Amino acid sequence: MVFNMRSTRGIFSSFESGYRFASYTLELSPFKTLIKIEIPMCWKPLVCASVLAWSRAIGEFGATLMLAGATRFKTETLPMAVYLNISSGDFEIAIGASLWLLFISSCLLLVLRMINRAV
């Protein structure tokens, strides 16, 4: 969540305040301004920030290892599964988990490119 908060704060701070003030003159509440004006205008950067935050979070290996440890079936994420299976000698499962990580990363990059190309 911290990964996404920095990007989201930057997105909304760069939002032109004239739109916000115009919505206030039309008697929209701040919540309705957010829902009806700001989010529709900033949906692409918000989706990109969320996808990037999710891709960073899925690759968090060091923090998981330091805080939760490497416990099979309890704190096992995909990067942790690669680590645990390589250390136990199950290379086929480690390669499978690595291929899943590559597939997920490729899908995320494809989604980002499709969003950036859409006008």
From Swiss-Prot:
The keyword Magnesium does not apply. One of its GO terms (biological process) is transmembrane transport. Gene3D superfamilies: MetI-like. SUPFAM superfamilies: MetI-like (SSF161098). It comes from the Bacteria. It is found in: Cell membrane. It is a multi-pass membrane protein. The chain crosses the membrane at residues 51-73, 91-111. Keywords: Cell membrane, Membrane, Transmembrane, Transmembrane helix, Transport. This is Putative uncharacterized protein HI_1475. It comes from Haemophilus influenzae (strain ATCC 51907 / DSM 11121 / KW20 / Rd).
